[in-house]
Amino acid sequence: MTLYKLVVLGDGGVGKTALTIQLCLNHFVETYDPTIEDSYRKQVVIDQQSCMLEVLDTAGQEEYTALRDQWIRDGEGFVLVYSITSRASFTRIQKFYNQIKMVKESAHSGSPSGASYLGSPMNAPSGPPLPVPVMLVGNKSDKAVERAVSAQEGQALAKDLGCEFVEASAKNCINVEKAFYDVVRMLRQQRQQQQGGRAQDRRPTGLGPMRDRDAGPEYPKTFRPDRARHRGGIKCVIL
């Protein structure tokens, strides 16, 4: 079964954990408990195709910037979250996006600091770098009376960044699946394009025999080698 690694990024308190748990465990978490790193797995069917999602819920605090580089290196697609009730969290989205771009470009250029796992479609050994699949999510759309960021501003930022946009409510389970599933759709399209390119050009790469991406690339068992700071381990939900 094909595995997709998604990473959720954004300021603390914007609802990253609430969105992730609503997607994977189908319930809403009322209490805010700052996350360092939690990983969840869920088997889903998207457009009549079964797949496994591995969703990494990350810390938004500034002191975890170094860890964030590792999370980004290991991720394939990204869900960037801000709260519509917080202009500061919206302003910080550009910083998170720039960090994604910097880390992925470093990985593609072959920098040791940007090395990622083998088989990542985002880090092909040759050719131009592929666009990084990103979904911008304005969470807490249920708090309309507290709105500090308009939907039009969110759409404009997404256009500037070249990514998709949706407003969502983890509390009311509105557009939660769309936020994650659309990233998977982008990843699928990229993998299909890469498979088509390899069918036309099968030159040796020095990395061993060609493999079918959708047959299951080789992934590490964890997002990062240091598990000491991992609070909850991998949560696995099989539907």
From Swiss-Prot:
<keyword id="KW-0843">Virulence</keyword>
<comment type="similarity">
    <text>Belongs to the small GTPase superfamily. Ras family.</text>
</comment>
<dbReference type="GO" id="GO:0019003">
    <property type="term" value="F:GDP binding"/>
</dbReference>
<dbReference type="InterPro" id="IPR020849">
    <property type="entry name" value="Small_GTPase_Ras-type"/>
</dbReference>
<comment type="subunit">
    <text>Interacts with mpkA.</text>
</comment>
<feature type="binding site">
    <location>
        <begin position="169"/>
        <end position="171"/>
    </location>
    <ligand>
        <name>GTP</name>
    </ligand>
</feature>
<dbReference type="GO" id="GO:0003924">
    <property type="term" value="F:GTPase activity"/>
</dbReference>
<dbReference type="GO" id="GO:0030448">
    <property type="term" value="P:hyphal growth"/>
</dbReference>
<dbReference type="GO" id="GO:0005525">
    <property type="term" value="F:GTP binding"/>
</dbReference>
<dbReference type="InterPro" id="IPR027417">
    <property type="entry name" value="P-loop_NTPase"/>
</dbReference>
<keyword id="KW-0342">GTP-binding</keyword>
<feature type="binding site">
    <location>
        <begin position="59"/>
        <end position="60"/>
    </location>
    <ligand>
        <name>GTP</name>
    </ligand>
</feature>
<feature type="region of interest" description="Disordered">
    <location>
        <begin position="191"/>
        <end position="227"/>
    </location>
</feature>
<keyword id="KW-0547">Nucleotide-binding</keyword>
<dbReference type="Pfam" id="PF00071">
    <property type="entry name" value="Ras"/>
</dbReference>
<feature type="binding site">
    <location>
        <begin position="29"/>
        <end position="35"/>
    </location>
    <ligand>
        <name>GTP</name>
    </ligand>
</feature>
<dbReference type="GO" id="GO:0005886">
    <property type="term" value="C:plasma membrane"/>
</dbReference>
<keyword id="KW-0378">Hydrolase</keyword>
<dbReference type="InterPro" id="IPR001806">
    <property type="entry name" value="Small_GTPase"/>
</dbReference>
<comment type="function">
    <text>Ras-like protein involved in the activation of Ras protein signal transduction. Ras proteins bind GDP/GTP and possess intrinsic GTPase activity. Plays a role in hyphal morphology and conidiophore development. Required for full virulence.</text>
</comment>
<feature type="short sequence motif" description="Effector region">
    <location>
        <begin position="32"/>
        <end position="40"/>
    </location>
</feature>
<dbReference type="GO" id="GO:0007165">
    <property type="term" value="P:signal transduction"/>
</dbReference>
<protein>
    <recommendedName>
        <fullName>Ras-like protein B</fullName>
        <ecNumber>3.6.5.2</ecNumber>
    </recommendedName>
</protein>
<feature type="binding site">
    <location>
        <begin position="13"/>
        <end position="18"/>
    </location>
    <ligand>
        <name>GTP</name>
    </ligand>
</feature>
<dbReference type="InterPro" id="IPR005225">
    <property type="entry name" value="Small_GTP-bd"/>
</dbReference>
<feature type="compositionally biased region" description="Basic and acidic residues">
    <location>
        <begin position="199"/>
        <end position="226"/>
    </location>
</feature>
<feature type="binding site">
    <location>
        <begin position="139"/>
        <end position="142"/>
    </location>
    <ligand>
        <name>GTP</name>
    </ligand>
</feature>
